């Protein structure tokens, strides 16, 4: 099995492409969904409240505001949550060894040094204008958090340069499907 990491900037189309691949029958893992599942655990919530005493109670929106405005709090949370995420990722890979390809969406793949867990990395990208258009349609959109995420993440250009493959998601569906089909063919040649 080839483990493929999918990354990209905020609102670049990562989840859309991951869902597309899932609908086509490929095994997929989403770091954001995994973390949301982890956050449902009461014991884990209590541990996070101990790590981040600034939080009066467990609330994902409050956590987002805190970690995007406090570098130390963000680092503490990442140091706690990343090992749990890695365990889930490794389990996903073990459970899917019989498949040719398995795709994992990891938004901060390079920033978190997760590239070591993948055979290949694909960066999803599009223009800043399209990313902003997509972002403002999200219920949880906050311009301050959006700007802070941009500061924290590597630039799209850096992610494209580091990646083995890249896909421009700022195109029509037909062109996007062509890019995904080409990616799959390129990857299947390497299995």
Swiss-Prot record:
InterPro entries linked to this entry: Depp_CoAkinase (IPR001977), P-loop_NTPase (IPR027417)
Gene field: coaE
Residues bound to ATP: 11-16
Listed name of the protein: Dephospho-CoA kinase
Top-level division of the source organism's lineage: Bacteria
Record lineage: Bacteria, Pseudomonadati, Pseudomonadota, Alphaproteobacteria, Rickettsiales
Pfam family, one: CoaE
PROSITE patterns membership: DPCK
Entry GO CC: cytoplasm
Swiss-Prot/TrEMBL GO biological process terms: coenzyme A biosynthetic process
NCBIfam families: dephospho-CoA kinase
Metabolic or biological pathway, per its Swiss-Prot or TrEMBL entry: Cofactor biosynthesis; coenzyme A biosynthesis; CoA from (R)-pantothenate: step 5/5
EC number: 2.7.1.24
